[in-house]
Amino acid sequence: MSLPGRRASSLPSLCFCVLVLAWAVACQQEVPAGSPSPPPEPASSPWGLVRSKVKEFLEPLVTKTRERWQWFWDPGAFQGFVQTYYDDHLRGLGPRARAWLHSSKDSLLSKAYNLCPQLLCGDRDQG
């Protein structure tokens, strides 16, 4: 199967995205307990098969990932991560940004002055 304007190498990514989208739609269609349930979709229908296969494949993966990252969502661990990130990257950002802007402005003005003919800009030492 060839899609117009697409390379064959993008086809697996497209198929994966379609499968994930189908799984997400199928999961959203599940109704909460207590409400009347729609008639079950026959497993032999094409979308029923896709839904069951995708769910069968992704459910263990999602569960395993959720269990592995549970420590990260603990308030203490998350707060520690944010504090460390702030200490490493954001502390003193204001003064560093001002210094960078000042040096960039000076550098840009110097380059512009060097490009300007002396007749128009005058002597650099005077201004």
From Swiss-Prot:
S-S bridge residues? none
State where the protein is found.
Secreted
Q: Where is the signal peptide?
A: 1-27
Q: Which residues cross the membrane?
A: none
Question: Per its UniProt record, what PANTHER family does this chain match?
Answer: APOLIPOPROTEIN C-IV
- Keyword Membrane present in the record's keywords: the answer is no
Keywords of the record: Lipid transport, Secreted, Signal, Transport
What does the UniProt record say this protein does? May participate in lipoprotein metabolism.
Enumerate the InterPro entries for this protein.
APOC4 (IPR028120)
Keyword hit for Secreted = yes
Q: Which family does it belong to?
A: Belongs to the apolipoprotein C4 family.
Q: Please cite one Gene Ontology biological process associated with this protein.
A: positive regulation of triglyceride storage
Quote the protein name from its UniProt record.
Answer: Apolipoprotein C-IV
The entry's cellular-component GO terms read: high-density lipoprotein particle; very-low-density lipoprotein particle
